[in-house]
Amino acid sequence: MIIFTITIIVMMLATILSKKTITDREKSSPFECGFDPMNYSRLPFSLRFFLIAIIFLIFDVEIALILPMILIIKTSNLMNWSMTSLFFIFILLIGLYHEWNQGALEWNN
């Protein structure tokens, strides 16, 4: 409880001491030698590509979790290992089916 209280006090002090003033707002605006920017600084980004990249990262992490299971087979019971492996792969396939069913894997809309 004491640690929680100290943490809250430190967070409140940090918030109070780090408040930006109105004059600091100009520091975050784009500046090109005193002129307004000639073009928009952010490029458009495909939302479909972002979604595919996130799905790839999720499945990549799951595959990285499957790889150590090969080393575990030597030290564990074969039945427990096979049930765990099948359950994990089943969850992977359910996730893939869900993404496919929702249309997240289709590039053209």
Curated annotation (Swiss-Prot):
Transmembrane regions listed in the UniProt entry: 2-22, 52-72, 78-98
Gene giving rise to this polypeptide: mt:ND3
GO cellular component terms given for this protein: mitochondrial membrane; NADH dehydrogenase complex
One Pfam family linked to the record: Oxidored_q4
Chief location bin: mitochondrion
An annotated Gene Ontology molecular function: NADH dehydrogenase (ubiquinone) activity
Name of the featured protein: NADH-ubiquinone oxidoreductase chain 3
Reactions catalysed according to its record: a ubiquinone + NADH + 5 H(+)(in) = a ubiquinol + NAD(+) + 4 H(+)(out)
UniProt function note: Core subunit of the mitochondrial membrane respiratory chain NADH dehydrogenase (Complex I) that is believed to belong to the minimal assembly required for catalysis. Complex I functions in the transfer of electrons from NADH to the respiratory chain. The immediate electron acceptor for the enzyme is believed to be ubiquinone.
Entry coiled-coil feature ranges: none
Family according to the record: Belongs to the complex I subunit 3 family.
EC number: 7.1.1.2
Gene3D superfamilies, per the entry: NADH:ubiquinone/plastoquinone oxidoreductase, chain 3
Organism: Aedes aegypti
